């Protein structure tokens, strides 16, 4: 009785329908006890109808689960598709903001590099001023040695440097704020990616429900067929009892007094006292033997059929649990996807802040960069001033040397002139004396009162007025050569 084709009672209808001739009621105590036992066992087996009911419930539940799984898959897939597209948009925005950050970082480093170079040039020039001592010939006697840098105010340079340091500090603070915003954006994207990765929807082709449902429907159909075979077997047993003298009484007695450990069986509604008095249509000997043969054969398979019903039910329960687990998994996926969508909504609420942070960083950096460049121009202007200052000092040395040379030339010329004048004076005095000696006795004195005057005396001297200063100082030859060389390099 493993299948409907071999089920108990599969040939009973043919046997019953072929009974056309009256037959005496079957006698024999042994046969009666066997028939009663088969009937009660068959009646007990009919309680397996609960497995068929459960099978129908499972199939109905599986169909509902299939519909629910399709809906959940569609909803989750739709949400995840939307989330995936929005994540692509967010990544583009993130990359755009990162470009702003990277450009700012690169620009900041370039500006700092340029600033360091400008400051290094200024410091180098100041070091030259610091190491260039003013020649003592230019300063009052007894004064402590002083460098060229001592004659300029360094506070202006320090003020510019302090201003640049403050601008750099503000720029770093702005960068730090942008870093915080960017890291927060990265955390949001990381949460989305992590959640999205863990809630991927399985493609519909991977769903176990359709195959399980087909198996469940097959089991349900087989179980219905098995139950039908049990019912046919019971009808055959009942028919045999009807054709056995005292059969109903024996059945009622056996049902009322079951052996110890046996499952009670109710035969009310099946057995009726009046049946004993009904003259059943008699069976031929051949029909009786054929019926008993089929009954005995089917009775041996009743227990196997009942076991098969239970086994199929157990297998259906396992499949059903797997279906429910899959639906539960899909439900959880949908819940997780919904939670990710809520995270996405939160990210989009914060997104304007991230974009504004990038725009604010760019604007503030451009303003700071303009100020830094302005300060660098001031530094460069100060450096050029110091360079010109150093060059002017070299020019001063060369000018003093030139003046000294000019003075020396003037002195030489004056000395030569004085020598010539002195010679002229001496010659003039001699001529005057000779003239007076020759004609002095003859010329009246009052004729020309100046006749006896001495020759005029001439002299060269340095003019002294408000702008006059002492003679230009003498400078060492080495100092003049160094300044001349440096001035030539500056001019070249």
Curated annotation (Swiss-Prot):
Entry keyword set: Autophagy, Cytoplasm, Membrane
Regions of compositional bias (Polar residues) in chain numbering: 1-20
One GO BP: piecemeal microautophagy of the nucleus
Family the UniProt entry places it in: Belongs to the ATG17 family.
Chain's role: Autophagy-specific protein that functions in response to autophagy-inducing signals as a scaffold to recruit other ATG proteins to organize pre-autophagosomal structure (PAS) formation. Modulates the timing and magnitude of the autophagy response, such as the size of the sequestering vesicles. Plays particularly a role in pexophagy and nucleophagy.
Domain of life: Eukaryota
Main location: cytoplasm
Pfam families registered for this protein in UniProt: ATG17_like (PF04108)
The keyword NAD is annotated on this UniProt entry: no
Species annotation: Sclerotinia sclerotiorum (strain ATCC 18683 / 1980 / Ss-1)
Name of the protein in question: Autophagy-related protein 17
Subcellular location: Cytoplasm; Preautophagosomal structure membrane
Statement: the UniProt record of this protein carries the keyword Flavoprotein: no
Cellular compartments per GO CC: Atg1/ULK1 kinase complex; phagophore assembly site; phagophore assembly site membrane
Gene, per the UniProt record: atg17
Biased amino acid composition, Basic and acidic residues: 475-492
Region feature (Disordered): 1-23, 469-492
Membrane protein topology class: Peripheral membrane protein
Annotated GO MF terms: molecular adaptor activity; protein kinase activator activity
